[in-house]
């Protein structure tokens, strides 16, 4: 059993290369908390989700709205990787895109296709949120673009880091690659617990790994 108020998210452990990597503690357990603030926030989140569902029911053709939202999200998220296409260009045929922007166009459309694939697999019941689904989506993201030779559909096979020129001076060093299967398995089991009551932890854990 884990008491939320005393939960230690993990620790920095020295690796063979001399740098320190952050190793998250496992979370697939029974969670308890003493603060009433958590219950209040959960109730507020559930209420707002209910309002969102009600709003969706009022839209005559919600699928069109969702498709536009996915396209906008794909465009904005892809800019992190340096793509420079506009929403208008993303809605055009590839033949109408200037040659210097076609790679960016393909990256955005890969993002759209990956999101649609994930939504379909989950809503159709074909696959739950799982490592297998994450890998399938990843393979679509890297299809025919920069990074397509970097093991699409697989977890990373080497150490990465955020900020700095190497792990030793980085702002954040995630767990080493050989721990990913174990950590993702723990996250997957946690996501599918019947008594899960703190879903906001999922996104935090995903970004940590």
In which residue ranges do the predicted regions lie?
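FIC/Doc superfamily catalytic core
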Residues: 1-209
């Amino acid at each position: 059993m884990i008491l939320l108020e005393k939960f230690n998210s993990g620790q920095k452990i020295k690796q063979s290369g001399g740098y320190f990597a952050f190793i998250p503690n496992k979370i697939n357990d029974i969670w308890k908390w003493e603060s009433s603030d958590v219950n209040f926030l959960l109730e507020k989140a559930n209420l707002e989700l209910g309002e969102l569902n009600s709003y969706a029911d009022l839209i005559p053709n919600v699928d069109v709205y969702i498709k536009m939202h996915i396209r906008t999200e794909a465009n904005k998220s892809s800019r992190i990787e340096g793509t420079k296409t506009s929403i208008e260009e993303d809605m055009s045929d590839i033949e109408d895109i200037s040659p210097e922007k076609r790679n960016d166009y393909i990256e955005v459309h890969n993002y759209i296709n990956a999101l649609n694939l994930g939504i379909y697999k989950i809503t159709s019941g074909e696959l739950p949120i799982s490592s297998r689904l994450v890998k399938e989506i990843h393979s679509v993201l890297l299809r025919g673009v920069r990074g397509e030779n970097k093991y699409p559909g697989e977890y990373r096979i080497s150490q990465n880091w955020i900020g700095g020129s190497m792990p030793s001076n980085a702002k954040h060093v995630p767990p080493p690659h050989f721990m990913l299967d174990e950590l993702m398995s723990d996250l997957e089991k946690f996501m599918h617990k019947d008594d899960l009551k703190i879903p906001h932890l999922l996104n935090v854990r995903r970004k940590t790994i």
